[in-house]
Structure formats: structure tokens, C-alpha cells
A protein has these predicted regions:
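Extracellular glycosylation-rich, acidic/polar low-complexity regions of adhesion-
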Residues: 1-199
């Protein structure tokens, strides 16, 4: 017997929140998440009151339980110690794409996004089935980075929608100065520095 415009009252955490029945016999009432978390019984109690043409008042009630999980996941991330064989970017590597690799753990999941920040730019990749990642970073950006440090982060979301982030950083060196070899010829190419007919 509920009618459009009847008042619906929700009770959560000892507080009441009201709304009206809509034309399609539904209702939608905003409840602060903080009150849902704080409610001791984790139960929403609902009631509706309606009055008929004769002035009789009727009330209906219902309740619905729910769960709370506000604990963020804790992913971890580790960058491999050397980004090249010797952990030094040389002049050749400065012109290449350098694969930066590492592993994740904790609550990190396959498919989570890993973000590397180098030279103020971000480069992203996904966690693979073996909990590793490999992300190409231009050697030029590794050379240009003022701190010569790769900053890595991973973000993961649990089943309840909580978001957790893990971070790590790894330094490296740059040497793009070409070696300068020297060579000298002996002053005399023969004993007297003269090529004769025999020589």
C-alpha cells in the first residue's frame, strides 16, 4: 500500500536518514560511509509509513546487513639493482631504449600497473604472471635525469575497492664521455729516417 511520496527512513549508527518513494516505487537515500563503518551491528534498518484515505497509518520495516573492509592492501616493489650490465649508461645506451626490470610482492596482483618516473616523465607497464615487470625507458631520459634515480610505484585495488601503493627507487651512473686514446710514431722509421734503395 506504499504510495509515491511516502517517507522512507533509514537508521544507521543511531542516526536517521530520510527520502521519498519515487514514481517507480523505488527510493535512494544517501548515507555517509563513515556512519556505515561506525554502525556496531553493520545493519541498515529501514521503515516506511503510509496513510490511507481513511486516515489509518501503516508501517513496514526491513533490515539489511553488510560488511566493512577499510584495510588497504600493501603491495611491495623492488627494482633490479643494475639497469645495464654495469649499472652505467654509456654513450651507446644513451641512444637506446633501456628495459628497467624488477619484481613485486605483498598484495600486488598480476595486471597491476607499475609506474616509473625518470627525468620528470612517467613510463608504465603491467605486472606479469611471475610477478615481474619490464618497462622500456629512453636512455636519453636516464642521462638527463638530475638525480640519476629511477622512482617506481605500484598501485593495487583489493576486492573491497581499497587502494594500496608501494614505492621503491634505484640509483645508477652515467658516463657518456668517449675515451681519448693517444698514439705516437717513433721519430725515425729507419735508422736515419731515410728510405734508401735497399729499404
Amino acid at each position: 500500500d506504499a504510495k509515491v511520496g511516502d517517507t522512507v527512513t533509514l537508521t544507521v549508527n543511531g542516526k536517521t536518514f530520510t527520502g521519498q518513494v519515487q514514481a517507480d516505487k523505488t527510493f535512494s537515500i544517501n548515507v555517509p560511509g563513515a556512519d556505515l563503518v561506525a554502525d556496531a551491528g553493520k545493519t541498515i534498518n529501514a521503515s516506511i509509513s503510509t496513510t490511507d484515505a481513511a486516515g489509518n497509518v501503516g508501517t513496514g520495516t526491513a533490515s539489511e546487513g553488510y560488511s566493512v573492509d577499510v584495510t588497504a592492501p600493501v603491495p611491495t616493489i623492488t627494482l633490479d639493482a643494475n639497469i645495464t650490465a654495469d649499472d652505467v649508461i654509456n654513450s651507446t645506451e644513451a641512444g637506446q631504449q633501456i628495459p628497467v626490470t624488477g619484481t613485486v610482492g605483498g598484495d600486488a596482483k598480476v595486471g597491476d600497473t607499475v609506474t616509473l618516473t625518470v627525468n620528470g616523465k612517467q613510463f608504465t607497464g603491467q605486472v606479469q604472471a611471475d610477478k615481474t615487470f619490464s618497462i622500456n625507458v629512453p636512455g636519453a631520459d636516464l642521462v638527463a635525469d638530475a638525480g640519476k634515480t629511477i622512482n617506481a610505484s605500484i598501485s593495487t585495488t583489493d576486492a573491497a575497492g581499497n587502494i594500496g601503493t608501494g614505492t621503491a627507487s634505484e640509483g645508477y651512473s652515467v658516463d657518456v664521455t668517449a675515451p681519448v686514446p693517444t698514439i705516437s710514431l717513433d721519430a725515425n722509421i729507419t735508422a736515419d729516417d731515410v728510405i734508401n734503395s735497399t729499404e
